């Protein structure tokens, strides 16, 4: 149940009846403060201006047409023309019952879309590092949310599996008589990459051989394709270990690397020329875009084919967008790529739209994100100034969580401790990132992320176990509880119920904006409201069975909401801590 949508519809109808245009925006929002009710309609200001009347006057007229019987206990006008809506306790009680009767907690399903989500995208022959963390876990939270809502989601792991570096790597492996790349660990490959690059830069004969190998690889030579495939396989096998550790839903089947689009590139260049969008300029093929200006104020030239016939990332990204619409039949495409790539993507998509490869009705959305910084406010590095490998970061998270859990549970069996430490450690790293607005940079801080206070994974995991402990202490007859009515008579019961019933609204925002921090903030709020409810509204020692059962049902919906919400973020819950 989306109460915000229900109220928006009711207020909109009343506004139209009061003389507002049919496309008026009621602007129904969750109220920021309890004294302003549960929801507030703020749309009177903009509409009253168009109608040439005072907002408060319009609000008064709207109220005469607004029928919220059975939904609101009170509706009042505040300030210059805000409409405050206070929900009826009986309505809240009924909605709590309905949510508990549904595995989906009453969350409705929107019109099903095919949504392609581009995320993670590590490079072949390199180990994943912290720079891949944000794209991987934010993208996965978006995927989980969209799938829960019922959409058909296609995960697209756009790995860097093509380019001149492969000629260089194959040449170096051959030189070392290590053609059987399948037996090598990725750590070896990283060393090979550095050595290969050094030789490529210093030894012209080696560089020439590497360039020849690229040509052979691109022409489809069986031997070179086989060597290339081995490099890709080693990398993806290693990456899958990291994905599994991170509790991320990506698999080998989701790999759609740059190489997938190679066969399309010559045709795209020819088509852009035929459409008059691409022209020859100084030997290269270029698209000049009026939408982007260079320093001189002239249209910016975007190269799609170099003098030597080579293609660029832009060409691949044009092909990629075209493929996602024409072959995957996407209704919407989301890209979780860092903010530094924004102009590059905008240029590629401008060309895509001009060429008619993807219609305007299909959104191409860059869900960009900021950087992960160290405590010094600079990009997060090792003490030696190197790139932090993702596997090393997760090892440290596990070790720190292990110490933390052992300290609080000295008698816990080793296997149980390991399982709990894994949930807490990995959860802490993910939640610390997901709880920040993705568009901003954030400071990576072990102490903060592993704290049991504040908006952290350990606190949220503990909050969940605390709710479960109520049920462990109570001798509950599940059937009797299922048929028991929900009674809302206390303010704290009403506040908790109203917030729990905003789960669907929260999911809708995350699905629309790709902002998992909104879900984190919501769950943290729910945990805090439950804490206040638990302290002020006795559950097991309630005055009678009816109140006890009703409060148990509120606790039950709290537990289910926390678990389901954390699951959409890819954060594991635990039964005990």
Swiss-Prot record:
Motif 'HIGH' region: chain residues: 122-132
GO cellular component: a single term: cytoplasm
Superkingdom of origin: Bacteria
Keyword Iron-sulfur (UniProt): no
Signal peptide: none
SMART domains, per database record: Arg_tRNA_synt_N, DALR_1
Keyword GTP-binding: no
Gene Ontology biological process: arginyl-tRNA aminoacylation
GO molecular function, one term: arginine-tRNA ligase activity
Pfam family, one: Arg_tRNA_synt_N
Record-linked CDD domains: Anticodon_Ia_Arg (cd07956), ArgRS_core (cd00671)
Principal location: cytoplasm
Catalytic activity from the UniProt record: tRNA(Arg) + L-arginine + ATP = L-arginyl-tRNA(Arg) + AMP + diphosphate
Subunit comment: Monomer.
Name of the protein in its database record: Arginine--tRNA ligase
Native organism: Salmonella schwarzengrund (strain CVM19633)
């Amino acid at each position: 149940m989306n109460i915000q949508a229900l109220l928006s519809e009711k207020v909109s109808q009343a506004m139209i009846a009061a003389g507002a245009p049919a496309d008026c925006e009621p602007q129904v929002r969750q109220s920021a403060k309890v004294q302003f009710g549960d929801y507030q309609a703020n749309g009177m200001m903009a509409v009253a201006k168009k109608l040439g009347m005072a907002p408060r006057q319009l609000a008064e007229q709207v109220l005469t047409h607004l029928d919220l019987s059975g939904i609101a206990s009170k509706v009042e006008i505040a300030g210059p023309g805000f409409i405050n809506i206070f929900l009826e306790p009986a309505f809240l009680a009924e909605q709590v019952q309905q949510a508990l009767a549904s595995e989906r907690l009453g969350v409705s399903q929107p019109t099903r879309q095919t949504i392609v989500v581009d995320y993670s995208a590590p490079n072949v022959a390199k180990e994943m590092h912290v720079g891949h963390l944000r794209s991987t876990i934010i993208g996965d939270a978006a995927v989980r949310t969209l799938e829960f809502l019922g959409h058909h989601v296609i995960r697209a792991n756009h790995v860097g599996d093509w380019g001149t570096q492969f000629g260089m790597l194959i040449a170096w492996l051959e030189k070392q008589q290590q053609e059987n790349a399948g037996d090598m660990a990725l750590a070896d490959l990283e060393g090979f990459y550095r050595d290969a690059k050094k030789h490529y830069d210093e030894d012209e004969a080696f560089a020439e051989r590497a360039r020849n190998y690229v040509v052979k690889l691109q022409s489809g030579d069986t031997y070179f394709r086989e060597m290339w495939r081995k490099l890709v396989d080693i990398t993806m096998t290693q990456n899958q270990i990291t994905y599994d550790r991170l509790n991320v839903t990506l698999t080998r089947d989701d790999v759609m690397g740059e190489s997938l689009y190679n066969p399309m590139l010559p045709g795209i260049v020819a088509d852009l020329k035929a459409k008059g969008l691409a022209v020859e300029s100084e030997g290269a093929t270029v698209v000049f875009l009026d939408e982007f200006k260079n320093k001189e104020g002239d249209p910016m030239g975007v190269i799609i084919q170099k003098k030597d016939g080579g293609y660029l990332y832009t060409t691949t990204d044009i092909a990629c967008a075209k493929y996602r619409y024409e072959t995957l039949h996407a209704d919407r495409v989301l890209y979780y790529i860092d903010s530094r790539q924004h102009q590059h993507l905008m240029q590629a998509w401008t060309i895509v739209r001009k060429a008619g490869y993807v219609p305007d009705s299909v959104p191409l959305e860059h869900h960009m994100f900021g950087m992960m910084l160290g405590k010094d406010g600079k990009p997060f590095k090792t003490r030696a100034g190197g790139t932090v490998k993702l596997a090393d970061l997760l090892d440290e998270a596990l070790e720190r969580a292990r110490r933390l859990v052992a300290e609080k549970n000295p008698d816990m069996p080793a296997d149980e401790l390991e399982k709990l430490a894994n949930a807490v450690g990995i959860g802490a790293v993910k939640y610390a990132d997901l709880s920040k607005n993705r568009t901003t940079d954030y400071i990576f801080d072990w102490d903060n992320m592993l704290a049991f206070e504040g908006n952290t994974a350990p606190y949220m995991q503990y909050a969940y176990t605390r709710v479960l402990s109520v049920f462990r202490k109570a001798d509950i007859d599940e059937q009797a509880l299922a048929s028991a009515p929900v009674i809302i008579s206390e303010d704290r019961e009403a506040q908790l119920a109203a917030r729990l019933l905003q789960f669907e609204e929260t999911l809708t925002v995350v699905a629309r904006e790709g902002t998992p921090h909104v879900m984190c903030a919501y769950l943290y709020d729910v945990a805090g409201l439950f804490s206040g409810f638990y302290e002020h509204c006795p559950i097991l020692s309630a005055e009678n069975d009816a109140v006890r059962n009703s409060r148990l049902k509120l606790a039950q919906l709290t537990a289910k909401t926390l678990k389901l919400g954390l699951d959409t973020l890819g954060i594991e819950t635990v039964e005990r801590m």
